């Protein structure tokens, strides 16, 4: 956590690069092109074999199939994640999900899965699930001896709301992909979804789609560290309806030798959200904070929320207070579950600086020169770094 200008993107680039070099599979969900330079470097280094940059656009949206599996095996967690996705499609952030709604949708998912297992001619997809709900589950509800009131579970309202994700609807591409996002063979993947961060319908759905793709990768990739980093996109998951999904994700990540990292700059987002406290902070043993001077007057709330000791508070408030003026670096505090903590300096070479920078003028210069050199970003960075050293 660090406010704008604290060196957060820089530190994260540095951290991620080291994870990657140690063999970790990294998946990033970003909303600001912070990792474009590093991703491009990896793509050049591997001759296009790695370093994949997905940018969400209307022409090339990110899509997947929540009902697809290689082997028709759906464990309890997979079924729960499908149910959570469907509730997200149906309900707005402020709508409270009742036990009946959650229970009925869970039962419908179960029954649909049994059907596609029994009849392999049915193509598992959101389209066929929607048809099952509309044609079969709705009829079965009406025929029950104990009636389910519309006020408890309004299936017509659900079908109407979800219609836009069904065949010929405006978002019919999202959940009916014939090709699934294949993350298995690539070790460094960035999903850039800045273009939809203001879209309250698409943003949470696409974020869940990416996280589901990551979880599918984790289940299949044994004995290798996997890392999911969610930048400001985590806000899409901070509604009360998402709490269960976040808990499920953290539990699953740990089980499969993975790490989930949430990156934020707005302290108010964290302080004001009980979901963040219950689902993210309580499941995070490692906490990393950058310069917090901007939030001095709110630091008691931060300390309470993160469960920091007085010693840890003093360490954090000392960040960048006595930096060596002859060196270029920014400090960062790392705390490990209350057992160990210290302040470190993020100090990088001129080459690393140019690969990590999010400064618009510097990025433009790097990419302009790369175009002239046939896309060789590494050669450009070496040239510019050498030029800077000569100036010094």
Regions found by a protein language model. Name each.
Residues 1-56:
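Glycine-rich phosphate-binding loop of nucleotide-binding enzymes
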Residues 26-29, 229, 253, 259-265:
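Structural recognition of the conserved hydrophobic beta-strand(s) that form the central parallel beta-sheet
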Residues 27-29, 52-54, 189-191, 261, ...:
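Hydrophobic/aromatic beta-strand patches that form the interior of the parallel beta-sheet core
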Residues 32-35, 59-61, 195-197, 234-235, ...:
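Conserved nucleotide-binding/hydrolysis micro-motifs of P-loop NTPases
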